[in-house]
């Protein structure tokens, strides 16, 4: 998209404000709102902002940063506030000397995309975004209660939530994001939105937009949408399974018609790389304390480091489709992650597998959830970290994933995770009160 096209859209749509969007290291979408006149005057050189108050960015003595709009991401928001139309554009973050900011999560993914392209690959991804829709109280605060007791693919006649999902799909289509499906998920009040796959970078941009639209539509209907991985005990948590493939030109590099399973060496090496780095990856793809309440046996979440052709109890599943649709599904990520950092780390792990020809173990087609510990030991099946603390310790030992994050983000990321863990470790929970108060 050219600046001339954007100028025409601004005039035709009577856009009054433009939101410059970027993402902090926690994955939180930030924005600076400016007028179209300021945007058209400043887009090329960048718009200055104070980076010292953004989580994981810079200290107060080096606070000046610049937002440079990525013009192809310009879109008019399909809702108004007080009748005024706004547009948004996603931005890259730059330092005052004109260099990409090392702490910008989007830059870390761009860097890994460039590495893949140097190897001759274009990486594609498509995530499945799961979330809960909850009621709110008179103060507008979310209430941790179910709105419905529906299950997987259930139809809820005349349900307000059905209207929310439709409005989400319509809004995303207006913003240029193709929605392939929306449906009720396994847990009560849990839902999923699937959108068309694209390159890793464009998909990460789209995922941030999808989360914004989901939350906005829920608010308009008087509800709260949460991407918390495990808000309720005893039911499935919300994951973000990621389907991914590598292409060379218009050919899927993961497909080999001469292989008995139709799978190329490159796919196997890519799988081998992810499995090798899976423990460290967990810190990035499952970055909250609550993430590890989801990663437990019995709730369809992966726990064991393995791969399979079709078996959903494995960490990596290869769906049955072949040809251009050949892909792997990485099942551990959850929607609390910073998707730019998660994609950068996953891509780094997979490319490490290809570069170093890391052979994965044999695929496991048994139900791993039903295996004994002796059987898992016999097959050398290890487990993902059981807590954020364990995952961060694994991350500290993994140079490939550290390099993908960059030293700046790695240090800030670990610092934030360890602070959360320390606070959580001293916090007295309701479970403890219920269990021990009468001692």
From Swiss-Prot:
GO terms for cellular component: cytoplasm. Pfam families: Gln-synt_C, Gln-synt_N. Residues 105-439 form the GS catalytic domain. Its cofactor is Mg(2+). Inhibited by glutamine. Oligomer of 12 subunits arranged in the form of two hexagons. In its feedback-inhibited form, interacts with TnrA in order to block its DNA-binding activity. This is Glutamine synthetase. It comes from Thermotoga maritima (strain ATCC 43589 / DSM 3109 / JCM 10099 / NBRC 100826 / MSB8).
């Amino acid at each position: 998209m050219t600046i001339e096209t954007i100028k025409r859209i601004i005039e035709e749509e009577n856009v009054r404000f433009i939101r410059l969007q970027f993402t902090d290291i926690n994955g939180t979408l930030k924005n600076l709102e400016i007028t179209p006149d300021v945007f058209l005057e400043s887009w090329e050189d960048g718009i200055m902002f104070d980076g010292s108050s953004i989580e994981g960015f810079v200290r107060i003595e080096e606070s000046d940063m610049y937002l440079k709009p990525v013009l192809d991401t310009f879109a008019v928001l399909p809702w108004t506030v007080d009748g005024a139309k706004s547009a948004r554009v996603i931005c890259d973050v730059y330092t005052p000397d004109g260099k990409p900011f090392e702490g910008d999560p989007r830059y870390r993914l761009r860097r890994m995309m460039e590495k893949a392209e140097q190897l001759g690959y274009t990486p594609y991804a498509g995530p499945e975004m799961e979330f809960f829709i909850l009621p709110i109280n008179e103060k507008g605060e979310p209430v941790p209660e179910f709105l419905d007791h529906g299950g997987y693919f259930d139809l809820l006649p005349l349900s307000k939530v059905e209207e929310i999902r439709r409005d989400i799909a319509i809004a995303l289509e207006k913003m240029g994001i193709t929605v392939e499906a929306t449906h009720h998920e396994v847990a009560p009040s849990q839902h999923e939105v699937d959108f068309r796959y694209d390159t890793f970078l464009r998909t990460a941009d789209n995922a941030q937009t999808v989360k914004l639209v989901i939350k906005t539509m829920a608010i308009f209907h008087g509800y709260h949408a949460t991407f918390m991985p495990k808000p309720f005990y005893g039911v499935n948590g919300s994951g973000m399974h990621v389907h991914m493939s590598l292409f060379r030109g218009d050919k899927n590099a993961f497909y080999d018609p001469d292989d008995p399973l139709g799978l190329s060496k490159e796919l196997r090496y890519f799988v081998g790389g992810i499995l090798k780095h899976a423990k460290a990856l967990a810190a990035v793809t499952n970055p909250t304390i609550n993430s590890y309440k989801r990663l437990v046996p019995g709730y369809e979440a992966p726990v064991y480091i393995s791969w399979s052709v079709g078996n959903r109890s494995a960490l990596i599943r290869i769906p049955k489709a072949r040809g251009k649709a050949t892909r792997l599904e990485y099942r551990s990520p959850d929607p609390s992650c910073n998707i730019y950092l998660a994609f950068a780390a996953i891509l780094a792990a997979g490319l490490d597998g290809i570069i170093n020809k890391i052979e994965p173990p044999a695929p496991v087609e048994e139900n791993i959830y039903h295996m004994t510990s002796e059987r898992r030991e016999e097959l050398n099946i290890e487990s993902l970290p059981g807590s954020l603390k364990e995952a961060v310790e694994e991350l500290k030992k993994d140079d490939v994933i550290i390099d993908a994050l960059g030293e700046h983000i790695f240090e800030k990321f670990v610092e934030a995770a360890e602070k959360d863990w320390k606070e959580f470790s001293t916090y007295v929970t309701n479970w403890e009160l219920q269990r021990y108060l009468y001692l």
